[in-house]
Amino acid sequence: PLCCDFVTLQPSHNDMVMKDYTAGHLSCEESRNYLKALQDQISDRQVTFYPGLGFHNIMVIQSRPFTKFLTPPNELIGEGIRKFMPDGDEFNDLIYIINQAQIILHNHPVNQKRKRENLDSANSIWLWGNGKKGTLPPFEKKFGKSASLISASLLFQGMAKAAGIGVVSVKGATGFSETNFDNKVETAIHELQNKDIVYLNVAGAEELSLKGNIDDKILTIEDIDSKVIGPLSKEISLNSGVKMMVVVNHVSSAVAVKYEN
């Protein structure tokens, strides 16, 4: 399996630049329309496309394991993609699929509609995250604690499910800056009544960093402080048996428009 993300590429001299790794925030409906077209028209390769969430989806291909890992598109904002494309005979099928997808997407009615509305079009797919299915020990068995996850991220959801951690759906949770913070906090407080550990993932500011949007990133951080950290701190102060830890898993720079090492 590989991650199959719809992206927006922009021509630049003799290369194509990764403009938007979300392809203009595709809706799930738009994405499913694209996936159906790819599945119907790429019939000469053993591939199956599975819908995920918006721009982020899965492609399964019958092949030997790849020896090289492919770069995530959100690490390539503003970069020419040529040097990051799959290289070598083992990737011939992937290159073919990407090229075919670009042709199919160029003529797709949804993309034509987005262009008329001056929206970024999903003019390519980006394949990455290749690997074998991993296994994790059950979290509760290993640590003796029950846990649940609140996150719109399919990556976090997948890891949680692999470890036997419950995944809680939240209405209005998008994984971006317009996510419903209030519902996420309310759900976290409810989960604390039945679980030893609740992992609440908030990633709205990350996307804004990768678009170089400093002003909105600051506003989103302020929202996280007032709508997430504040209410949770107040609730936890009423329960002496609960502690809160705030952590980051990586740093994304709105100045460099990429992740910082």
Residue ranges of model-derived segments:
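Feature captures the catalytic ectodomains and active-site-proximal regions of enzymes
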Residues: P1-N261
